[in-house]
């Protein structure tokens, strides 16, 4: 995919995410059930986060240069400590959700487990690509 096509696709998706944020905000206002309201709130926050990521990707792609990686001032040990915290939370929420029968509570605990799994993966990415590996990446 050419950079121009990718840029257009990212911009289109950014518009979509911004629209979704508005839709979910409306659904939060209109919904009375606490679990459904929480789900819509999470979806709204995720859409907002997706917009942030898309804006970063658009900026990153627009530079068309080698990015000079600024140092990430974290130690390997600190990253491993954070990863351990996320892994413990993942195990806790996964085990708890396996013991729950109520579908709404099971959904909430499963959402938390999924988020903890993503957090672990993101921390691992930072560790591997910004702390342990010190090379320049072409945009």
Describe the function of each predicted region:
Residues 1-139:
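Non-heme di-metal
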């Amino acid at each position: 995919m050419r950079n121009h096509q990718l840029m257009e696709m990212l911009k289109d998706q950014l518009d979509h995410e911004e629209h979704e944020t508005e839709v979910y905000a409306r659904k939060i206002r209109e919904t009375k059930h606490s679990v459904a309201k929480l789900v819509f709130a999470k979806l709204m926050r995720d859409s907002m986060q997706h917009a942030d990521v898309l804006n970063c990707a658009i900026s990153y792609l627009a530079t068309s240069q080698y990015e000079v990686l600024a140092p990430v001032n974290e130690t390997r040990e600190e990253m491993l400590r954070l990863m351990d915290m996320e892994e413990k939370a993942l195990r806790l929420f996964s085990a708890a959700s396996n013991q729950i029968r109520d579908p709404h509570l099971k959904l909430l605990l499963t959402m938390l487990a999924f988020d903890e799994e993503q957090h672990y993966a993101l921390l691992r990415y930072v560790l591997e690509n910004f702390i342990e590996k010190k090379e320049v990446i072409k945009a």
